[in-house]
C-alpha cells in the first residue's frame, strides 16, 4: 500500500484517471455472492476505490440492502429506513463507484454475476449439506433470509443451517 495513502496533510489532486461509473439493472442478488465479490474487489483494487455505494434487491428479503464503502472499508445491511420493497414495485439493483482507473464493464459484470441463481432444489427435497462434512438434510425453505436454502440436518438435534450459494461445494443432491 502507498505509504501516503492516509496522509491527510498531503495535497490532493485528481487527474483524468479518476472517474465514476453507475449502473442499474432489474433483478435480485444473492447477498453472499455480493459480499464475496466486494471482498475480492477491495483486496485487489481497494486503494483505487475512493467511494462506492448502492441500493440492492436481495432475493428472499423485503428490506432494501444498502451498502457503502471507502477504499478497503465496506459496510452493508438491510435497511427498513430506506424502505421495504413494495408489492408490485420492480426490484432492482443500483450502484455507483468513484475511483482511479476503474473498469466500468468489469464492475458491471461483477455485480451482475452476483444475481440470485435459479435454484436446483425445492422445499422437501433430501440433500447433503456441507457443515464441515456433507451431512444428510432436508430443504425447509428456499430463499430464507437472503440465503438460497434453509436445511434441516437429519440428526438427533435436527439443527438448521443456511446454504449461502447453490452449488456442489455447499449442497448436493441426496440419494
Labelled PLM ranges:
Residues 147-152:
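Short aromatic-glycine-enriched beta-strand elements
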Residues 119-120, 155-175:
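Intrinsically disordered, low-complexity, charged/polar segments
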Residues 131, 143-146:
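A generic structural motif
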Residues 64-70, 138-139, 161-167:
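Short amphipathic beta-strand/extended segments with alternating polar/hydrophobic composition
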Residues 97:
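Flexible loop/N-cap segments at domain edges
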Amino acid at each position: 500500500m502507498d505509504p501516503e495513502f492516509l496522509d491527510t496533510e498531503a495535497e490532493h489532486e485528481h487527474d483524468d484517471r479518476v472517474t465514476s461509473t453507475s449502473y442499474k439493472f432489474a433483478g435480485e442478488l444473492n447477498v453472499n455472492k455480493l459480499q464475496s465479490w466486494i471482498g475480492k474487489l477491495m483486496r485487489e483494487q481497494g486503494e483505487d476505490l475512493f467511494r462506492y455505494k448502492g441500493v440492492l434487491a436481495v432475493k428472499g428479503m423485503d428490506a432494501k440492502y444498502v451498502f457503502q464503502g471507502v477504499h478497503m472499508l465496506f459496510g452493508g445491511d438491510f435497511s427498513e429506513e430506506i424502505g421495504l420493497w413494495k408489492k408490485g414495485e420492480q426490484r432492482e439493483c443500483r450502484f455507483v463507484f468513484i475511483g482511479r482507473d476503474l473498469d466500468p464493464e468489469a464492475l458491471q459484470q461483477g455485480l451482475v454475476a452476483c444475481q440470485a441463481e435459479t435454484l436446483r432444489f425445492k422445499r422437501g427435497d433430501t440433500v447433503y449439506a456441507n457443515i464441515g462434512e456433507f451431512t444428510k438434510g432436508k430443504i425447509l425453505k428456499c430463499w430464507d433470509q437472503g440465503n438460497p436454502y434453509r436445511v434441516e440436518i437429519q440428526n438427533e438435534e435436527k439443527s438448521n443451517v443456511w446454504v449461502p450459494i447453490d452449488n456442489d461445494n455447499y449442497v448436493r443432491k441426496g440419494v
